[in-house]
Amino acid sequence: MTISPPEREAKVKATVDKNPVPTSFEKWGKPGHFDRTLAKGPKTTTWIWNLHANAHDFDSHTSDLEDISRKIFSAHFGHLAVIFIWLSGAYFHGARFSNFSGWLADPTHVKPSAQVVWPIFGQEILNGDVGGGFHGIQITSGLFQLWRASGYTNEFQLYVTAIGALVMAGLMLFAGWFHYHKAAPKLEWFQNVESMLNHHLAGLLGLGSLSWAGHQIHVSLPVNKLLDAIDAGEPLVLNGKTIASAADIPLPHEFLDVSLISQLFPGFEAGVKAFFTLNWSAYADFLTFKGGLNPVTGGLWLTDTAHHHLAIAVLFIVAGHMYRTNWGIGHSLKEILEAHKGPFTGQGHKGLYEILTTSWHAQLSINLAILGSISIIVAHHMYAMPPYPYLATDYPTMLSLFTHHIWIGGFLIVGAGAHAAIFMVRDYDPAKNVDNLLDRVLRHRDAIISHLNWVCIWLGFHSFGLYIHNDTMRALGRPQDMFSDSAIQLQPIFAQWIQNIHALAPGNTAPNALASVSQVFGGDVVAVGGKVAAAPIVLGTADFMVHHIHAFTIHVTALILLKGVLYARSSRLVPDKANLGFRFPCDGPGRGGTCQVSGWDHVFLGLFWMYNSLSIVIFHYSWKMQSDVWGSVLPDGSVAHIANGNFAQSALTINGWLRDFLWAQASQVITSYGSSTSAYGLLFLGAHFVWAFSLMFLFSGRGYWQELIESIVWAHNKLKVAPAIQPRALSIIQGRAVGVAHYLLGGIVTTWSFFLARIIAVG
């Protein structure tokens, strides 16, 4: 067959408009300047709510896609500025208020702290003894471990980084202003996906990974090799001088001297010649493939992670040369999508290119779904393959990082549902999507949703039924009739099979590796300083049961979000939903039973199920790790676990979860008064209050409050102190938004205080 050369694309040019929008502080100083109605100023208290709701809804400011794109682009720089300021604050605390040097000297006994409370009226009780003579609040962000892995050896270096982050923040703020007011990209620049993919893949991910690999190789590895030797009690000698403490370690730039660094890694003597002559094995002492964990630190081998980032860099730099721009070579995304047809999928992906280059909601939705999923995968990798030194034995940090990444993932995935529904309402054009995949999914949405609903009902009744059965049998004193590892077994055979494959496979796939990918699949206990860093996680009946609760709650969350997206424009009940918009409380007066059908309401309801779902995930993790993994290694080699292995028997019943997990482990937060964790006791109480406060918004109607307000306004009129701005009750949607925000805030802070008071006390 002959292959005709691909059509040359139109030449790509980075085109900008000069000075498109004047810089006017006078205009910005006027609240609501972006909306004609809001700019008139407040008539009623609803104004302030609408101001917040619409400030960042760029679609409502203008219908010009180019201007919307520029606003989003500019806002990204603003977001980056905020992130740099936040990071600067974290590094500044590490530099100014922390025991980083003390922790570095003795990471197995000293706990990380980067905040010291000032004594005003007794709060200094919060400054607990974290070891090494330092008193402060124990932090659980994992920053100390990250800093050690990066090669920081003193607080001054953290200071410099904090200042550098502020400089970067200033640069980002300037860039955000410059690319909106001085040189704003044209729409075609935002829509040029091939160039965008090439630059993001090769530049951001490829060169980003390469520069990090370079930092790891030239700074992190020598510093960490010296620190590990000190911690192992066998300090190394450099240029005839024993490196006995972190203070003796040469500064990063000194390792540019090949004669110095090659005393630690002889491979550096090979120089770049070995690279160009393909004699890559010369670098095998600092680019390794060991597998498993470093026995001194309980973290991944940093020589493995340097190798990993170098490999990732190569992959992404190659990937960044795949898409066709000015050189008539490579892929065209439009061609790929339009060629993507199956035997049963009609026009396939035709039309999706146009959607993803004109609807940023559609684009954002996909990105949120992927990023949310990645965040949840990261949560699991944090304990399966702990990446930083001494992270795995810092149990409060392990629990915090897992919980954090799980919740972030949940919020992002709900956000994916939200923006998919907004896309359907605001940007979807049925005439341009005839018989493509999106159209076909929408046409058989009833089949999809009814089947998904059936799955949810099946999972819910069966998984819950197993627990109810066990509670009943235990209450009747018939343990032999329970589902358990010692009676009627429900072993997770597929999960055990996967664990076994992963434990055995590296023997064949990586014969030179020292250990398998992760100890959680099977292998030996890795202990650091007498504490378990990693151990095989044995799964049994209790895990099988709670796993099916996970399956149930995740499927219900997916059902709510997917129903919201697929029925965002129309349904049998409300055929003209597309005209009502993304958020509306009900289909007007005179149509009862049409409330909570808008796209927004599905996001609202999905948030509750997301929270419900992920609470059980983090409870499962917290209890399982305390019961079966975390603990102290006794002199005879056995492990005394924090919760003494009670998960397998107690987690079989609902009563067990309530009594042996929630109630038993809440004793630390409930009895924290008068101790350095007493703040968690107050947060625990306060967060319960915030959570209960949310119910006032969720369980009452707007009319009740409007009636009350009018009576209060009457009293003010009597006293001639009536306000100029007329008070109004929250709209139905606003009430629900305030309700769900407090519900989630209260729930998350309750869990946070419960987890940390417990694990700081026992971990």
Swiss-Prot record:
Transmembrane helix keyword on record: yes
List of residues binding chlorophyll a: 696, 704
Entry-linked NCBIfam families: psaA
Complexes and interactors: The PsaA/B heterodimer binds the P700 chlorophyll special pair and subsequent electron acceptors. PSI consists of a core antenna complex that captures photons, and an electron transfer chain that converts photonic excitation into a charge separation. The cyanobacterial PSI reaction center is composed of one copy each of PsaA,B,C,D,E,F,I,J,K,L,M and X, and forms trimeric complexes.
Entry membrane topology: Multi-pass membrane protein
Enzymatic reactions: reduced [plastocyanin] + hnu + oxidized [2Fe-2S]-[ferredoxin] = oxidized [plastocyanin] + reduced [2Fe-2S]-[ferredoxin]
Locations listed in the record: Cellular thylakoid membrane
Residues that coordinate or bind chlorophyll a': 688
GO cellular component: photosystem I; plasma membrane-derived thylakoid membrane
Protein name per Swiss-Prot or TrEMBL: Photosystem I P700 chlorophyll a apoprotein A1
Organism of this sequence: Synechococcus elongatus (strain ATCC 33912 / PCC 7942 / FACHB-805)
Protein residues bound to [4Fe-4S] cluster: 586, 595
GO molecular function, one term: oxidoreductase activity
Listed InterPro entries: PSI_PsaA, PSI_PsaA/B, PSI_PsaA/B_CS, PSI_PsaA/B_sf
Binding site for phylloquinone: 705
Family of this protein: Belongs to the PsaA/PsaB family.
Cofactor binding note from Swiss-Prot or TrEMBL: PSI electron transfer chain: 5 chlorophyll a, 1 chlorophyll a', 2 phylloquinones and 3 4Fe-4S clusters. PSI core antenna: 90 chlorophyll a, 22 carotenoids, 3 phospholipids and 1 galactolipid. P700 is a chlorophyll a/chlorophyll a' dimer, A0 is one or more chlorophyll a, A1 is one or both phylloquinones and FX is a shared 4Fe-4S iron-sulfur center.
Function: PsaA and PsaB bind P700, the primary electron donor of photosystem I (PSI), as well as the electron acceptors A0, A1 and FX. PSI is a plastocyanin/cytochrome c6-ferredoxin oxidoreductase, converting photonic excitation into a charge separation, which transfers an electron from the donor P700 chlorophyll pair to the spectroscopically characterized acceptors A0, A1, FX, FA and FB in turn. Oxidized P700 is reduced on the lumenal side of the thylakoid membrane by plastocyanin or cytochrome c6.
Record lineage: Bacteria, Bacillati, Cyanobacteriota, Cyanophyceae, Synechococcales
Keywords for the protein's UniProt record, in alphabetical order: 4Fe-4S, Chlorophyll, Chromophore, Electron transport, Iron, Iron-sulfur, Magnesium, Membrane, Metal-binding, Oxidoreductase, Photosynthesis, Photosystem I, Thylakoid, Transmembrane, Transmembrane helix, Transport
Top-level lineage group: Bacteria
Transmembrane region(s): 72-95, 158-181, 197-221, 305-323, 360-383, 399-425, 447-469, 544-562, 602-623, 677-699, 737-757
GO biological process: photosynthesis
EC number: 1.97.1.12
